[in-house]
UniProtKB/Swiss-Prot annotation:
A GO term, aspect molecular function: RNA binding
Transmembrane stretches, start-end: none
Pfam families (alphabetical): Ribosomal_S9
Protein species of origin: Desulfotalea psychrophila (strain LSv54 / DSM 12343)
Domain of life of the native organism: Bacteria
PROSITE patterns associated with the record: RIBOSOMAL_S9 (PS00360)
Alphabetized UniProt keyword annotations: Ribonucleoprotein, Ribosomal protein
Similarity comment: family membership: Belongs to the universal ribosomal protein uS9 family.
Region (Disordered) location: 109-130
Protein name in UniProt: Small ribosomal subunit protein uS9
GO cellular component: cytosolic small ribosomal subunit
Swiss-Prot/TrEMBL GO biological process terms: translation
Family matches, as HAMAP family: Ribosomal_uS9_B
Length: 130
């Protein structure tokens, strides 16, 4: 049986992208909206296209994604991560180019927690000698 839908998840900070790839013409739908409509001016289109261009599958798959959490910039990065992992499901031979481009690696940087007895994660309360 040939699979016609490929699923993967991508993450960045607190953003989670659930991504489905189906054979198509290259449309990208995010939370039932077009990407330019959902992301607005901060839209980083090149990040979403990079996994497809790396694997020579540009405009061969339609993307349907649901995004939750985080800000818009983190959501774009999570979407690119999810697309990369879904492309890996379509063809295991995509692993080498995606890995060389660094698209399969999850960005582990997250906000550092606030510590008690301090103003923030690193900032201290003002110190007075007298």
């Amino acid at each position: 049986m040939v699979q016609d839908r490929f699923y993967a998840t991508g993450k960045r900070k607190n953003a989670i992208a659930r991504v489905w790839l189906t054979p198509g013409t290259g449309k990208v739908i995010v939370n039932k909206m077009a990407t330019t409509e959902y992301f607005g001016k901060i839209f980083k289109e090149h990040l979403i296209e990079k996994p497809f261009k790396t694997t020579d599958t540009f405009e061969k798959y339609d993307v349907i994604a649901t995004l939750k959490g985080g800000g818009k910039s983190a959501q774009v990065d999570a979407l690119a991560h999810g697309i990369s992992r879904a492309l890996l499901e379509t063809d295991p031979e995509n692993r080498t180019p995606l890995k060389q481009a660094g698209l399969l690696r999850r960005d582990q940087r997250v906000k550092e927690r606030k510590k008690y007895g301090q103003k923030g994660a690193r900032a201290k309360f003002q110190f007075s000698k007298r």
